[in-house]
Amino acid sequence: TALPICMEDVSDHALALMLSCLRHIPLRDRGVREGKWNIQADSFRLKGKTLGVIGAGRIARALIRKVSGFGFAEVVAYDPYISAEQLAEIGVRKVEKEELFRISDIISLHLHANAETNGMICKETLALMKPTAILINVSRGPLVKDEDLLDALRGHRILAAGLDTHNHEPLGAQSPFCQLDNVVLTDHTAYSTAEGVTELKTKAAQNVVDVLEGRTPRYPVNHL
């Protein structure tokens, strides 16, 4: 494998989606291009907000490190596999899932899709969220029940969503998500930067060189 990789890239993208949602950057960009000005859309600052991360692995920790300078009131996390003491070491308070949904202004997903996590973002969890909250998904599409999220966005029961991963890819221009102004959509490329691709190729090549020269590969899967 070439892992760990793309932690910086995906966490950068999560932060970019947060800012895009809070400041309505795509909406304002389109408006200016169409000749509009003084576009009416309430924007919000990051300072004083509560960030909730679901899944506190490498990418989430990279994001937590990056947001430390934005003045968040608190960063909380739900991860059943990481102790409260471990999270406290990086300045994060461990909470239960329901509390995270209730108190967070921004919820960022950083976990694998499996039988336990698929459909985690659903009618019940969306109902717990603040009407000013935003959801960020740079992980996996199946974590979200699309119809439930669409209903919440259409009804303005949450402020916005920033989605890089989707249940159906490519998403397609006819997707209901494309009809909404309170969604920022990208094409499952959170991992893709010039530096990230170079790192991927370098690590993969290093594994080959290690084997050919009789060494244990530097990035074996069972060492993750």
Predicted segments, located by residue:
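Glycine-rich Rossmann-fold phosphate-binding loop(s) that bind the pyrophosphate
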Residues: 56-57
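Phosphate-coordination loops involved in phosphoryl transfer and adenosine-cofactor binding
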Residues: 47-50, 72, 123, 132
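Rossmann-like adenosine-cofactor binding region
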Residues: 82-176
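Conserved S-adenosyl-L-methionine
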Residues: 69-74, 155, 159
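Conserved acidic E/D residue at the C-terminus of a beta-strand in Rossmann-like folds
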Residues: 77-81
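C-terminal helix-to-coil terminal segments
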Residues: 1-13, 167-224
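Phosphate-binding beta-alpha-beta segment of Rossmann-like dinucleotide-binding domains, i.e.
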Residues: 2-50, 62-65, 70
